[in-house]
Amino acid sequence: MARSSIEQLTSFLKSVNGRAKKALSQNFLVDGNILRKILATADVQPGDWVLEIGPGFGALSEVLVSQGANVIALEKDPMFEESLSQLPIDIEITDACKYPLASLDDKGWKGKGRIVANLPYHITTPLLTKFFLECPNRWKTVTVMIQDEVARRITANPGDKDYSSLTVFLRFFADVQYAFKVSPNCFYPKPSVSSAVVHMRVHEDFPLSGSEIDEFFALTRAAFGQRRKLLANSLKNLYPKDKVFQVLEHLGFSEKTRPETISLEEYLKIFRLLKDF
């Protein structure tokens, strides 16, 4: 019986006198059709190296292995260690937020691989940030199930109410697509919110490199720190206001431009000009 079976899951939990831990965002996927859709979206090929975060009982791990992937899984809850060890995967009982991704090489990881995961919702943003700041060149694709609200935020367009600094951050590194929505009924226990799968195809090259990346994201974080403010006011702690006005005018923007209306490409132009003016 597949690990996506609710009977299999509940039987396991009973056998270890365990339960889903809300503090770890443990809502286990128990729908085989959704697992197959995730696999198709991620485009996992035999021999691919795949990093999985929070495998839990291993429903996703199982289908990744069936596709011929080399899976390294990071799981915080030791309750699942013995069960996961029955699968042909490399399992680490660790906090994914603290795990040094460079150490994947010690496990035989070769070339560019993929991230495929049902991310714990309470650490979605820290993990997405870590994946790209720590080793952006390691990934071909990132396919994750996250809270639907967050999925809509990171796939929003300039001018949308959900458009945010996280949107700009992820688009710097990848093409980001909203793949499909997932009902709470597909989980055990049922979460109180809907979920969604997002697929990111990582760029071969990035617009900036080195310390400029940190400087650029300092600008975008400041811009969105007080999103109802004018851009020039939001950036006043980083750049003189008159300099920001000069750059905006040079690029054809109004002095009343707000941060949530500016695209990644436009932010890059603003950043480069602020460095040069």
Swiss-Prot record:
Binding residues for S-adenosyl-L-methionine? 27, 29, 54, 75, 95, 118
Q: Can you tell which superkingdom this protein's organism belongs to?
A: Bacteria
PROSITE patterns, per the entry: RRNA_A_DIMETH (PS01131), SAM_RNA_A_N6_MT (PS51689)
InterPro entries tied to this protein: KsgA/Erm, rRNA_Ade_diMease-like_C, rRNA_Ade_Mease_Trfase_CS, rRNA_Ade_methylase_Trfase_N, rRNA_adenine_dimethylase, SAM-dependent_MTases_sf
Role played = Specifically dimethylates two adjacent adenosines (A1518 and A1519) in the loop of a conserved hairpin near the 3'-end of 16S rRNA in the 30S particle. May play a critical role in biogenesis of 30S subunits.
Family to which this protein belongs? Belongs to the class I-like SAM-binding methyltransferase superfamily. rRNA adenine N(6)-methyltransferase family. RsmA subfamily.
Query: What is this protein's record name?
Result: Ribosomal RNA small subunit methyltransferase A
Q: What organism is recorded for this protein?
A: Chlamydia muridarum (strain MoPn / Nigg)
What is the organism lineage in this UniProt record?
A: Bacteria, Pseudomonadati, Chlamydiota, Chlamydiia, Chlamydiales
- The record's gene field reads rsmA
